[in-house]
Amino acid sequence: MGTPSRKTRKVSRNTDYVIAIPSYKRAETLRDKSLQVLKEYNIDPSKIHIFVANKEEEQIYKDTLEKGSYGKIIVGVPKIGPQRNFISDYYPLGKPVIHMDDDIQGFIEYDPKAKRSEKKLTSLKKIIEDGFRECKKHNCRLWGIYPTPNGYFMSDKVDSDLRFIIGCFNGMFNPGTKGPKGVKLELEMDKEDYERSCRFYKADGGVIRLRYVAPKTAYYTEKGGNQEFRTKKSVMDGAKWMVEHFPEYATLNLTKKSGYPEVRLRDKTKKKEEDD
């Protein structure tokens, strides 16, 4: 499913969002990458909340990060799945929350007139407003961006069916982890973003993916973070868990160039097949 050109969309500027950045053993990476990107796009530092694993990490981050470049540091829990759950329970239900990784190097946007049909993203604030507005339009809570920074595969469309919502940058109306509409992740590490995509889709009947913007990041290669725990076995275990627990949506994909096992998402209960 898609919607027409972005040119017809009006932009609201009133979304009271926060940006939650979980980070582990990457204080310098966060300082030099994601925080610099947010500064470049004129994001209010008071909106930026950094979630660390323990008190020791908290002190390291306070000593490393530039004062005034973020709002606050919150001590959460180790491992990305439990930390995502901690973040969901930290904020009020319905709060607009951006989840952002600590190693984002930038963003590109689709432009059919540009070389490779892509250019540097003009406005991150507009993308954030677009995402939350599309969620309201389609009565769902999770939105994300295109996972691959390659204009050849991107387009000026918005998806609202089952799509993989990449974990490095996405937004949601905070669901919490409790109650019939809560979203609680079971996976602690690898493929937690696939699990989140499926759980939101199952709860809401749709997720939003903006095809016209993508992140620049180092998947599977940046030291620290998930790489502290990741092995090919852990990635395979996560992929197999997805197929076992969401057989109506998930299929194992062993053909990715990364060399790591991946998951393909499609709602198999529907007749029409679309690429993820």
Where do the model's predicted regions map?
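Short, well-formed alpha-helical segments that are part of the catalytic scaffolds
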Residues: 21-42, 57-64
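A structural signal for short, well-ordered beta-strand segments and their strand-loop junctions
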Residues: 97-101, 141-146, 207-211, 251-254
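Hydrophobic targeting segments
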Residues: 16-21, 38, 47-50
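Conserved catalytic core of nucleotide-sugar-dependent glycosyltransferases
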Residues: 107-194
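Active-site-proximal specificity loops/subdomain of glycosyltransferases
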Residues: 51-100, 105-120
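Well-ordered, non-membrane alpha-helical segments in soluble/globular domains
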Residues: 31-36, 117-132, 232-238
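C-terminal catalytic/acceptor-binding lobe
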Residues: 12-15, 26-33, 186-276
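Arg/Lys-rich, intrinsically disordered low-complexity tails that mediate electrostatic binding
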Residues: 1-10
